[in-house]
């Protein structure tokens, strides 16, 4: 199990949202590059970045901050938020981002995501942003018509890096991990017969050391 710290970017600042709601943002660091350097200096092996403005339909605002972060640290970076086309994806790969996390596009344009995943072998994660058993898209504002298993089955033979699973109701709430949610979603992934090497990244609700202990007890890889 690996712990991956996250930086959520809004207006070129590090923020925390509650349940992914745009209007709830709280700034905790005005210097994203410094936050990224801090995570690297304390020994983190990878960094997770979410471009919230892009996710909410405001692209390009944080692009320069993302480039600065990439240039300032040597650890791998995975990036999500607002990647809605192959052009968007290639733009980030060109900056040196190691892995991309694709949500809405994986639902609405699966053929394009399949092409990207085959071109960039083992570099694409699909994002399952879940609320009340529904996959949410477009900045978590719309319900997808696809159910969880439907989406997983679309990609089960694709050379993905993995799945990023977010418990939206728990995200940013600092209430602790919902292990029942985790068990249910992981069970769905297993029943979809996806590649055994698929990586599962969990987000939403991880608050303290006890959450990590409880997660470890689930024996996830």
Language-model regions: role of each:
Residues 3, 54-70, 84-90, 104-125, ...:
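Active-site-adjacent beta->alpha loops and helix N-cap segments on the catalytic face
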Residues 3-9, 47-49, 77-81, 100-102, ...:
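Hydrophobic faces of well-ordered beta-strands that scaffold small-molecule active sites
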Residues 12-15, 19-23, 97-171:
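Conserved anion-binding
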Residues 13-60:
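N-terminal beta-alpha supersecondary unit
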Residues 28-40, 85-90, 143-154:
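Short, acidic/polar
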Residues 38-41, 68, 91, 115, ...:
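Well-formed, non-transmembrane alpha-helical positions, independent of function
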Residues 68, 146-201:
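Active-site/ligand-binding-proximal alpha/beta "capping" segment
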Residues 73, 77-99, 180-193, 199-221:
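Catalytic cores of alpha/beta
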């Amino acid at each position: 199990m690996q712990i991956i710290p996250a930086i959520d970017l809004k207006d070129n600042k590090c923020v925390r949202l509650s349940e992914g709601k745009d209007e709830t943002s709280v700034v905790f660091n005005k210097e994203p590059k410094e936050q990224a350097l801090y995570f690297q200096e304390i020994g983190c092996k990878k960094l997770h970045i979410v471009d919230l403005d892009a996710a909410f339909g405001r692209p390009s605002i944080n692009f320069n901050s993302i480039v600065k972060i990439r240039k300032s640290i040597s650890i791998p970076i995975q990036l999500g938020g607002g990647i809605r086309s192959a052009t968007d994806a290639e733009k980030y790969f060109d900056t040196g981002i190691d892995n991309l996390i694709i949500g809405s596009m994986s639902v609405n344009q699966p053929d394009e995501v399949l092409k990207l995943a085959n071109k960039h072998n083992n570099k694409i994660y699909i994002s399952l942003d879940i609320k009340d058993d529904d996959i949410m898209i477009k900045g978590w504002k719309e319900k997808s018509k696809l159910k969880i298993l439907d989406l997983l089955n679309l990609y089960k033979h694709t050379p993905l890096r993995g799945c990023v699973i977010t418990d939206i109701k728990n995200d940013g709430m600092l209430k602790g991990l919902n292990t029942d949610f985790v068990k249910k979603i992981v069970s769905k992934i297993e029943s979809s017969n996806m590649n055994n090497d698929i990586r599962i990244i969990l987000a939403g609700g991880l608050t303290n050391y006890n959450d990590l202990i409880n997660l470890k007890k689930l024996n996830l890889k």
